[in-house]
Amino acid sequence: MTSHLKKVELHCHLEGAAPPALTAAQARKYGVDISAELRDGAYVWHDFASFLVCYDKVSEVYRTEEDYALLTETYLDELAGIDTIYSELIVSPDHGKRIGLGADAYISGICEGIRRAREKSGIEARLIVTGERHFGPESVIGAAEYAARAANPLITGFNLAGEERMGRVADYARAFDIARDAGLGLTIHAGEVCGAFSVADALDAVRPSRIGHGVRAIEDLDLVTRLADLGTVLEICPGSNIALGVFPDFASHPLRRLKDAGVRVTISSDDPPFFHTSLKREYELAAGTFGFGDAEIDAMTRTAIEAAFVDDETRKALLARI
């Protein structure tokens, strides 16, 4: 249905993209029992709490620089196989520290995976360093400082993820100031678990060019108009939203309504195998379920490239491929 279309992804958590087959091999390598979390080639969870447990258990089997190179390469190879030309991966140097690998080795492994994948298929990728709300403002500021001083050409953006209900967006504004001053692109998770107010708070406190999810802005039509007027880009992940119960079904999902209202929207997969989806499926949903034609889908893909955290030369080259 969309196999002939070029694809771009702006919102995907690296550990959340771990292919089940690779995770199973990694678990065997380290002698880790993941039978409760991985059955018949699929990740198993039944509510948000068990999703987090499953996610953490899967992350446990990626431990070394080479493990992260392999994970990154494998996912980007999968994307390249469906004609994806660009991917932004959400990564957490804090996670690298927590598992004892270290932030630098964690990032180095991921960058090596990007290099290997690009060498094979030409796929471009960049990294968005994320702070995690549930670890508090100081931790998030530390993540921003790491991204700012890394001087790594593949680190081009900064994000805030984690539990949306932990603190006000304003509590984390300093981290975004640090990232902005370093020339990093800004995006933030909002309007997913929490309502439209969290999107408004993000616009007020952070002034991001993009918002991760943002779909619950639909609950406030004045806010929808504001998003359209500002040109703020939403990184929308329909499969994730349904899997987590943000909306009960695709018929009630606001992707089409947001786009028709003039909001700049893009398509991503979030944590694809955990939500039994993929970027390929998300594009197919756009066509088959939401009724977008090829030209409309290409327009969303161009929007993603226009909003990507890349230099102008790379952006121009990517746009030429659509």
Swiss-Prot record:
Q: Which residues bind Zn(2+)?
A: 11, 13, 189, 270
Catalytic activity from the UniProt record: adenine + H2O + H(+) = hypoxanthine + NH4(+)
Which residue positions does UniProt flag as site: Important for catalytic activity? 213
- Name the domain of life this protein comes from: Bacteria
Q: Which CDD domains match?
A: ADA
Name the SUPFAM superfamilies on file: Metallo-dependent hydrolases
Catalytic-site annotation from UniProt = 192
Q: Where does substrate bind?
A: 271
Keyword annotations for this protein, in alphabetical order, are: Hydrolase, Metal-binding, Nucleotide metabolism, Zinc
Gene Ontology MF term list: adenine deaminase activity; zinc ion binding
**Cofactor remark from the record:** Binds 1 zinc ion per subunit.
Question: Which Gene Ontology biological process is one annotated for this entry?
Answer: hypoxanthine salvage
Protein's job = Catalyzes the hydrolytic deamination of adenine to hypoxanthine. Plays an important role in the purine salvage pathway and in nitrogen catabolism.
Tell me which family the UniProt entry assigns to this protein. Belongs to the metallo-dependent hydrolases superfamily. Adenosine and AMP deaminases family. Adenine deaminase type 2 subfamily.
Protein known as:
Adenine deaminase
